[in-house]
């Protein structure tokens, strides 16, 4: 059974990659200070699928944008099923 795409925004590298691969994603946010090995697959998948990447200065700032109290390397705006 296919996984349902979450509404609105997902946070974190694993959830972002899953959304990019399985859902319609409007854009992906990546913190500039995130470690490259954490975001590499996400960047590649976005490039392959033509998804816009928005770079945010820090993980802390991205976490705050997503309404969480810790830093986040990535997040994605999900707009529906692929």
Curated annotation (Swiss-Prot):
Q: Which UniProt keywords apply?
A: RNA-binding
A GO molecular-function descriptor? RNA binding
| Keyword Cytoplasm in annotation | no
- The answer to whether keyword Iron applies is no
Tell me any Pfam family this protein matches.
Answer: Ribosomal_L7Ae
Family affiliation: Belongs to the eukaryotic ribosomal protein eL8 family.
Name of the protein: RNA-binding protein TTE2299
Species source reads Caldanaerobacter subterraneus subsp. tengcongensis (strain DSM 15242 / JCM 11007 / NBRC 100824 / MB4)
């Amino acid at each position: 059974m296919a996984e349902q795409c979450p509404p609105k925004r997902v946070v974190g590298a694993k959830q972002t990659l899953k959304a990019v691969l399985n859902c319609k994603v409007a854009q992906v946010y990546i913190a500039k200070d995130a470690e490259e090995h954490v975001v590499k697959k996400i960047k590649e998948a976005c490039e392959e699928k033509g998804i816009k990447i928005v770079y945010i200065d820090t993980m802390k700032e991205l976490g705050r944008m997503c309404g969480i109290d810790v830093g986040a390397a990535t997040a994605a705006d999900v707009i529906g099923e692929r």
